[in-house]
């Protein structure tokens, strides 16, 4: 097992070397500039449109699509807001220092524009099944936009692998927390997860959308409130934590055994990878649900990507990072999963249990979203008949994740995420002029934009 872990770690270091980090940031910068800094210039409009207006029309499912914009956003957030927001942030801080948080913010800022572009493309390129239902995902804009059917199949297979790796992460997080805090056997956690996820799998997209619409807003608000309470009780430590975030991002002081520029690179790598794992910008996962949404213009759905990254990383991940920072627990030898939860308990013991409850909901809703993406990818690559026969295999991966070593689980997930990103980035690079044209059309059309500026 040690030799396997060493081999995978070597692959992971190469895959997530500076080249991929720079490509991701560079592409995010490209989409930010070519779309007129959409995440800044139109932020107020985007929040109103995606949160206020879409919530009011959350049950309006008239038009060309399968689910409403609000439900599509909740399904996507169900897949985004998970262990990465809690344990992923703790892992980044433990490995890259508090400076990793700064790079997480940088990745999120440019990731807003990148995710916006992915969703716009998912609305432009969609397919239909034999019954006329809309099909969406990165496979379609790669197949039709790049005229590369073979690459569409490749990313579908890689996406299946990525979702399986993500399943291991969420299952491992849940089992690790329950085992450490409540002595629940890891195998029992795995069995319970299989049963719960199986119930969702049997219900399909409609059931997933309804569950996500109910759970995601509640659990996100709940976690934010608990986190803010911890921060307020340690308010005097906040300025020092903010200072550490910015100074350690460029500090030459050794962190986690590193020296010089290596430390900065380490903080950058962990901040960007963990931030990306959480908000999924550039990964190609957002197009699955958003491509099925009912809208009048592709950009109307695209702007939800800005909101998702903001809520997921700038709000929820930042709260986790600051809580870990103000309590000082990141300097301990605890595992990331335990560290994140214990940081809440240092202020008031019951808060640890509340944070545990929130984390369990985060991870389970993420498992639901990942199953949906895996099923869509598998269907594209192997056909609906094969998918119907194997769709119940995904829940059984929970037992493997529950029993596997956490460091190995994150390494596997990093590799899978890096592999699936590459073909998606190729498509985003080639197709960015189409996104730019759609953006100009949307924000210059009074039908879509002018009436909402008032």
Kindly label every feature range from the protein language model.
Residues 1-79, 83, 94-100, 232, ...:
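N-terminal alpha-helical transmembrane segments of multi-pass membrane transport
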Residues 3-4, 34-39, 84-89, 164-175, ...:
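Transmembrane helix-loop junctions in multi-pass membrane proteins
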Residues 21-27, 67-76, 147-161, 191-192, ...:
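Select transmembrane alpha-helical segments in multipass membrane proteins
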Residues 23-30, 34-47, 172-178, 185-246, ...:
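Membrane-interface loop-to-helix entry segments
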Residues 30-32, 107-132, 138-201, 357-367:
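Helix-loop-helix module between adjacent transmembrane segments
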Residues 38-67, 91-98, 113-146, 330-346, ...:
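Flexible loop linkers connecting adjacent transmembrane helices
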Residues 58-93, 121-139, 143, 157, ...:
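Alpha-helical membrane segments and immediately flanking helix-loop junctions
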Residues 116-126, 228-244, 252, 256-259, ...:
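Extracellular/periplasmic helix-exit of transmembrane alpha-helices
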């Amino acid at each position: 097992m040690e030799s396997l872990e060493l081999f995978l770690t070597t692959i992971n270091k190469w895959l997530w070397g500076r080249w991929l980090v720079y490509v991701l940031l560079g592409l995010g910068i490209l989409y930010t500039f070519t779309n007129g800094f959409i995440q800044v210039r139109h932020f107020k409009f985007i929040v109103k449109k995606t949160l206020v207006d879409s919530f009011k029309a959350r049950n309006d499912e008239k038009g060309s699509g399968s689910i409403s914009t609000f439900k599509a956003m909740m399904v996507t957030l169900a897949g985004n807001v998970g262990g990465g927001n809690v344990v992923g942030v703790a892992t980044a801080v433990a490995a890259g220092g508090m400076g990793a948080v700064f790079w997480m913010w940088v990745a999120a800022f440019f990731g807003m524009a990148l995710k916006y572009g992915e969703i716009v493309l998912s609305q432009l390129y969609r397919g239909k099944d034999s019954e006329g239902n809309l099909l969406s995902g990165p496979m379609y804009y790669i197949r039709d936009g790049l005229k590369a059917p073979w690459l569409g199949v490749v990313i579908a297979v890689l996406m299946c692998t990525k979702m399986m790796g993500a399943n291991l992460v969420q299952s491992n997080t849940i089992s690790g927390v329950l085992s450490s805090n409540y002595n629940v056997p890891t195998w029992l956690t795995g069995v319970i997860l299989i049963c719960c996820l199986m119930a969702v799998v049997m219900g399909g997209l409609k059931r997933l959308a309804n569950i996500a619409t109910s759970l995601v807003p509640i659990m996100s608000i709940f976690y934010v409130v608990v986190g803010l309470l911890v921060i307020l009780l340690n308010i005097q430590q906040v300025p020092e934590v903010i200072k550490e975030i910015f100074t350690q991002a460029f500090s030459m002081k050794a962190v986690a055994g590193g020296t010089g520029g290596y430390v900065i690179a380490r903080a950058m790598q962990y901040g960007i990878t963990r931030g990306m794992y959480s908000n999924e910008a550039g990964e190609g996962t957002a197009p699955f649900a958003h491509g099925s949404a009912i809208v009048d213009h592709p950009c109307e759905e695209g702007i939800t990507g800005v909101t998702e990254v903001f809520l997921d990383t700038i709000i929820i991940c930042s709260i986790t990072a600051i809580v870990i920072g103000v309590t000082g627990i990141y300097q301990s030898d605890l595992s990331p999963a335990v560290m994140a939860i214990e940081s809440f308990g240092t202020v008031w013991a019951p808060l640890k249990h509340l944070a545990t409850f929130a984390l369990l909901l985060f991870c389970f809703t993420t498992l639901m979203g990942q199953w949906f993406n895996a099923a869509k990818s598998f269907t594209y690559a192997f056909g609906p008949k094969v998918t119907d026969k194997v769709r119940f295999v995904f829940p059984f991966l929970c037992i493997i994740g529950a029993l596997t070593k956490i460091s190995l689980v994150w390494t596997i997930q990093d590799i899978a995420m890096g592999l699936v990103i590459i073909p998606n980035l190729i498509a985003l690079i080639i197709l960015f002029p189409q996104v730019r044209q759609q953006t100009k059309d949307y924000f210059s059309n009074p039908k879509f934009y002018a009436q909402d500026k008032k």
